[in-house]
């Protein structure tokens, strides 16, 4: 089993749809956790402006391992939430509607 990896999900949410989108994000983490796809590390969600163009939501969570990402992509309950998120987001300023960089924490001390 590989090490956990942290996802920094960037969602460029359509104007006027932030509350609806956040309701889906509120379901997302608990589903992933119940399915054993993410660690017990709390999911963090941030909302701001993707200046100058519109709302940006960032969701940070920790996959249990790299394989969890693949398993999530084939699970119908996860797919249902992801499919509902898609229409609420938009490409903006030449950037995709959603981006999912995965990073590993390093100790620099």
Regions found by a protein language model. Give the residues of each.
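Short amphipathic alpha-helical segments
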Residues: 17-43, 77, 81, 85
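Short, well-ordered beta-strand segments in beta-rich or mixed alpha/beta enzyme
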Residues: 5-12, 42-76
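Glycine-rich beta-strand-turn "strand-cap" elements at beta-sheet edges
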Residues: 1-3, 39-58, 81-109
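Short, charged, low-hydrophobicity "junction" segments
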Residues: 1, 13-14
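Histidine-centered active-site/metal-ligand motif
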Residues: 28, 72-75, 102
